[in-house]
Each structure stands twice: as C-alpha cells, then as structure tokens.
Amino acid sequence: PLSKLGWAHLTLRHLDESRDYYEQALRICQSIGDRASEIPVRYGLAQVEMERGRLDEARRHIEASLEIVESLRGRNSSLELRSTYLALKQDHYQLYIELLMRLHRGNPTAGHASAALQVSERARARSLLDALSEAQIDLRSGVDAKLVAEERRLQRKLNDMSAAQMRLLSGKYTAEQAAALDANVRETIDLLDETRANIKRTNPGYAALTQPQLVSVERIQRELLDDGTLLLEYALGEERSYLFLVSPSSLQTFTLPPRAEIEARARRVYDLLSARAPDSRGGTPQQRQARLAEADAELPRQAAELSRMILAPAAAQLGEKRLLIVAQGALQLIPFAALPEPESGRAGERVSEGARGQETRGNSSFLSPSHSPTLPLSRSPALPLSSTPLLVKHEIVNLPSASTLAALRRETAKRQPAPKTLAILADPIFETGDERLKLSEAQTQRATQPDPDQPGQTAAQHRPQHLARAIEAFGEANDEFAFPRLTSTQWEAEQIAKLAPADQVFKALSFDANRQLVTSGKLSDYRIVHFASHSFINARRPDLSGIVLSLVDQRGQEQDGFLRLHEIYNLKLPADLVVLGGCRTGLGKEIKGEGLMSLTRGFMYAGAPRVIVSAWEVQDRPSATLMVKFYRYLLGPKQLSAAAALRAAQIEMSRDKQFAAPYFWAGFTLQGEWK
C-alpha cells in the first residue's frame, strides 16, 4: 500500500518522497470514505511535517488523526475494547505532545503547553471516565428482561467456570484440558461483553449520555486545586519526557529523560523497595539476608537518582504542598512518598504559563543521565538531595488522571452520605483444615486471638497446597502465591472497631467475611469499608482479578469466595473510602493509556471516590500495625482526612526502628479524591 511506501521513505529520511506517497494514500482514503485507514496516513504525514519543521501543518494532521481515533472508539460500547483500541494509538498522543512542546519552545506565550497537557489528559484513563459516566444511569432500566437475565446467567457461568478452572489447575490435568477450559472462559467473557453491549444499546438513557468531559487547565486550577496543592502529571516519551506542574495560578513544564531511562530506573527502585517480599529464588536464610543487605545499600542511591530524574527539576516549586501525582508507565509502581526530597538545584528546561496564558521562560537546562541499561548513577553534575522522604513534607495522592478527579467529585456531590461509619471484613477462612472449623465457639474465641507481638506470616512461609498451583497458572504464575491465614487481621479489626461507636460499626470476621455479604448490598450503609484479606491478580484476564473472602462455610463445605473485579463493578457502594489492606491490591495489568487495571477502578466505579491500596506483599503484622495507626488518625481525636491520616501513620511507622525500612510503610497509597 501507498502508506507503507510512505513509511519506508520516512525511515530513510526521504521526506519529499514520503510525503508524496502519504498524500496519495490520503486522497484515496478520503475518496472511498475509509476513515480507519486515514488514521495511520495522517499520523505519517504529521511525522513527515515535523521532520521538515512545518509544525503547524503537522499539528493539523495529528489532530485530524486523533479526531478519527476518538470517534471510532466512541462507537464501541465495550469498555474493554475501547481501552484496547486506544492503547494501540498511544504513539499518536505522544507525537502530539512532543509536537506541541516544540511549538511551545518556539512561542512560549501561545498556550501550547496548556494544549499539551490537554492532550495528555485525552490519552489517559478514558475507559474509567466512560465507566464513571455510565454510573450515572441504571443501565438495566427499561431494557428487555431477557437481556438482563442472560447477563446474570453468563455472570454465574463465568464465576462457575473460573472456579472450575482453579479446581482443575490445583489437581492433575493435561495441557489439552487446561487449554479447552481457558478457551471456554474466553468465549464466555466475549458473550458477556456482547450481552452488556446490547444492554447499553437498548437502554433509553444510554444514548443520551454525553462523552465524559475532559478538564481544561483552567478547570484544574479553579476546581481541583487549592493554594496548598499541586498537580504533577507525567507524560513519558521515546526521545524525551515531560512533567506538567500545575498550581492554582500557573502551569510549568519540565523536560525529563526518555521513557526507557525513567522506566528502567523506576522498576529497579520498585524491586529494591519490595525486596523483603517473598520471592522464588530460595536459598538459605543467610543468603536471603545478604540479598536484603545488598538491596538496602543500593536503594538510597537508586531512589536518589530517580528523584533527580523526575522531581529535582521542579524542586523549587514543591515547598511543603500536597502533591497530586498522575504517573505513567512504570512510575505507577512507585510510591512517591518513599523517594528522597529533592532540593533546589539545576532544574530542567522550564517554561511557566500563568493562569491567563502569560508565560515566562526559565534559563536553566537539564542534563539527562547516562542511557546505560545497567543503571549506573548519573555522571551529570549532582543535584543537592535530601535523605528525607518526600512523605515528611508532603501529602501524596495518586490519580489516574485529573479528569478522573473531576468526574469523581461530580458524582459524589449529588449523593447523601451513608448513614453509618465503618464496615470491616477480615480474617476469612481459606482452608477446610482451618482450626476454627474444629473448635467450639468458646475455644474459637481463645484460639483466634492473634498475638500482635509475634512475627507475621507471608505466603512464602506458609503455603497451603489447595489452590496454590491453580493461582500459579491462573493468576500471576508465581509459585509463592498462596492463601495463608492472615493471623493479625482479627486483631487489626478489633482495634479499628474500637475507634467508632459500636452502633456505627459492622464487623464480619471468619466465616462471615464472605462474598455473599459483599454482593448483598449491606455494605452500602457504611461510609468506610475495610477489607483485610488477600487479593489475586489475573494478568491475562483482569476482570477475573479480585479479593479472596471465605472459601469455606461453617459446615466445612467449600464455597466461591472470590470477589472478582467484574462483580465489584456491579456493586452499589456509595462509601467515602474503601481500604484494601491486602497485598498488591494496587497492582494489575497495565494497558497503555489506561494505566494499571487494578481493583481501584472497580471500587471507584462502584461509588468510592478514594481507595487505599498496596503496591507489594507486606507481612501480616506490619500491615495490620499501619492500618491501626491510620484509623487512629482518621477516626480518633485528630479526625484527619484520609490522605493526611495515611501520611501521619506512615511517618510514625518510619520512625519505628523495627519498621523503618520503606518496605513496611511505603507500599500503601491513596488513590482518588484528596479532600
């Protein structure tokens, strides 16, 4: 095709020939009305014109390309297909941001930086925004009852097949059996998606839904921030990356190193932060201790280098303000609270854009670190860097996008708060061999009181056989994954419950912490919902990720205790806060442009504007200790906001020699509304 010839000449930098082929291809696409094929042609023309220095012409082509992308995406009623489609077009958004920033450098007063931030927002979390918009209506109201019944049937079938898949994979099976069942699961998911799409198409209110509104820079400044809050939005690019720093009165941009360089450093920092988590390398206790000592020694240097890369250019602007972080790529794994506080030094290229478009250019430059994949420390002139964690001076809040925060505020502003304070689900039964099945009620009361002074257990130390292999194949392919009892969570629940009046608290422990309770609607009466249990991640099928609740009933019979993400989306949960105290609840499959497909999204869609999640597997006892401290600041005499309470609890933990390592306190982050 002509477009491929255009691309071939572009790679050879034969720009005139490339443009000619692309323009011929564009004329053909327009003459036959092939809008889908017009997308890559316009993208190619934008690249050619950028190389020729014709930036305004390049902008015309890339904007036209993205208008078609977003139009075609909007025609698909499946949120999953929308997100997948947009993921394939992320290079278009990256090109547009780079183009606008080049225009910005040439004319800093023309508002190009604002336009670049707007494009960054267009590229992010669009399916989550769509879902939040859909939450405004009852999608099943006024729809053919047969369609609704079919959806429920397929949901039950999917749950049954998911459980059957786990049972199969936990016993003896052939590769053919596993492949056949996986194909059936995939087919059922496709049928369920198709049924839901039909429900949307036939819903009287769905057609009237407008596309979710993306916030402008002016709206961010006016509605989402205050004088004590900054927005830091990262846009990672192949040649260079950008940091957009927004205050109520200004927009500043900083040029950062390329995506590959930042992501390599970020992944290394994440590995070092989570080094104490169980792993599959085995070895003697002495070998493990040696690995931890090596990680502890390397972490300060690597974290300092990451801080230099992504924070130091803007250090002079941070002060002691609250930081709203919109991360991208591997930066989503990083708890910014654990990074060292940068100090003012040589900043990156900076251009300030006032609230009314008045801009001033900074004179400093940024020297990026070495591109070596072995990640040596930068040979660039060292910036002054404090050893103090960012947490000490700043509340840190994570957002999928600024537009998501606006949507969450819009939805929660309309509703009445739930009448009661706190619901807690903790310490479920995971195995038929659990001692609580064998003891009398009085014995159970004595035997299940955990000793908070005893070391916690992790999956690596205590792996039950049933379901372990299933999760290995079905979820993360991690042979350390299992469901040991979290012995400190009952102590955690009891301590937290004491902080609110008894008639305002609901506790579901042991057998009562089950899936049926969550799906019954009972939790909608509570402003705070706290889960203290395991989670599981299905990287291949994100909708089948979820939370593990009681897998055994009081008669000792196995039951479905897996609360899956696709079920969380269907909850009606108008809570102010959901806390997921289990391991790795903030992780999930990354889809470009959408971010991590974690449990956070499901609970936001269900109605929670803020969710606390974890980034790695933390031992039972320190996790429970942190949660109790958090609730003391949240519900105790100080009555702090959720963001401030989490920060205060983490600072307190970090000053305890026993839990001073960031692994113990930095993994929990607040996602969503900061107020």
Predicted regions and their residues:
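Amphipathic alpha-helical protein-protein interaction segments
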Residues: 55-343, 385-393, 398, 402-462
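An often Trp-containing, charged/polar helix-loop segment at the C-terminal end
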Residues: 411-416, 421, 469, 622-675
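Intrinsic disorder/low-complexity segments
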Residues: 341-388
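Functional beta-strand-loop-alpha-helix junction segments that form "active/interaction loops"
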Residues: 213-219, 291, 296-309, 476-544, ...
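Catalytic cores of nucleophile-dependent amide-cleaving enzymes
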Residues: 491, 527-629, 633
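TPR/Sel1-like alpha-solenoid repeat signature
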Residues: 1-9, 21, 28, 38-49, ...
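Cysteine-dependent hydrolase recognition
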Residues: 399, 404-535, 583
